[in-house]
Regions:
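Short, glycine/polar-rich helix-capping loops at beta-to-alpha or helix-loop-helix junctions
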Residues: 23-34, 215-221
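Single conserved hydrophobic/aromatic residue that forms the stacking wall/gate
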Residues: 1-7, 12
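A structural signal for hydrophobic residues in beta-strands of small regulatory alpha/beta folds
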Residues: 39-40
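Active-site flanking residues adjacent to catalytic metal/cofactor-binding acidic residues
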Residues: 8, 181-182
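Glycine-enriched alpha-helix->loop->beta-strand junction motifs that scaffold or abut catalytic
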Residues: 16-17, 35, 150, 228
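PRPP-associated nucleotide enzymes
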Residues: 44, 51, 55-181, 189-274
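Conserved G/P- and acidic residue-centered "switch" motifs that form tight phosphate/ATP-binding loops
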Residues: 13, 183, 188
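Short beta-strand/loop segments at the ligand-binding rim of alpha/beta enzyme cores
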Residues: 14-19, 204
């Protein structure tokens, strides 16, 4: 169990780790009795540990590989390092991601939704409600909610300008334990906006499950600072490695892709320059 103590409120969430992390009030003995193996005295210490957890074990597991293979096979993720795409922000990227294509590929869709369900059952067994991000996470939250027989809803990017002016669609009671379902995490901004809305509504956000993460430092740091845990089915490093193994890209391109991942604003990876 991974535990965080803030003031007198104990929040417990499951983790594959067997260590407890607490910070807040109380003597070291009191905190240890509460189940902590590691005690942090400041939010900064806690954030550092959370960041370490977000980075996680770099070894590829079977699910990461399978989902990577699936996304590559339907071109939901594909690489073009010699002819980079341009994001809306102006950043040039060697990768294009469109996880909406998952919905049009029934076999892959089944693999992905089953993996999301298994991840929630393993990492967030206390989940009471699934909330999709608008719009990419809505379908996945709905399908998995049906599979798990859990209520689902979604969070709009902004409140409606008519009717009840809801930003949260679906019934959500204060104190309910929520898992956010997202398709893609890059800098973390959009999913953190959703978490903020849910917390303001009184929900206890257990964490996020996403299909794919870039693993960008900025995103990891922002999630850790907000004390939000994200568990992704696969990640940029795994997809780059699998893409090279299956000859979607050249083996020498992997280093360039990771250079982009480490600092998207640095365009020295383009054309193989250093």
């Amino acid at each position: 169990m991974l535990r965080s103590l803030v003031g007198s409120e104990m929040c417990i969430r499951d983790s594959i780790r067997t260590a407890g992390i607490l910070y807040g009030y109380g003597t070291r003995e009191e905190l240890a009795q509460a189940g902590a193996d590691l005690i942090c005295r400041t939010p900064e210490e806690f954030t550092k540990i959370m960041l370490s957890e977000q980075q996680g074990d770099k070894r590829m597991n079977a699910t990461e590989r399978k989902i990577a293979e699936d996304l590559l096979s339907i071109r939901a993720v594909f690489f073009r390092p010699d002819e980079p795409f341009t994001w809306a922000s102006g950043i040039k990227s060697p990768v294009y991601c469109d996880n909406r294509l998952i919905l049009t590929a029934p076999d892959v869709r089944t693999e992905v939704e089953t993996a999301i369900m298994q991840t929630i059952e393993r990492e967030y067994p206390q989940a009471e409600v699934l909330m999709g991000t608008s719009t990419a996470g809505i379908a996945h939250a709905a399908i998995v909610g049906h599979m798990m027989k859990l209520p689902m809803g979604y969070v709009r990017g902004s409140s409606k300008d008519h009717g009840r002016q809801n930003q949260i669609e679906g019934r959500l009671e204060k104190g309910q334990k929520v898992v956010v379902v997202e398709d893609l995490v890059s800098t973390g901004g959009s999913v953190l906006d959703v978490v903020k809305v849910l917390r303001a509504a009184g929900a206890e956000v257990l964490g996020v499950v996403s299909i794919f993460t870039y693993g960008m430092k900025k995103g990891l740091e922002r999630l850790a600072a907000a004390k939000v845990r994200n568990v992704s089915l696969t990640n940029f490093d795994v997809i780059a490695q699998v893409a090279a193994e299956q000859k979607y890209i050249k083996p020498e391109d992997v280093a360039r892709l990771l250079q982009f991942r480490n600092d998207p604003s640095d365009e020295s990876w383009i054309g193989g320059t250093n």
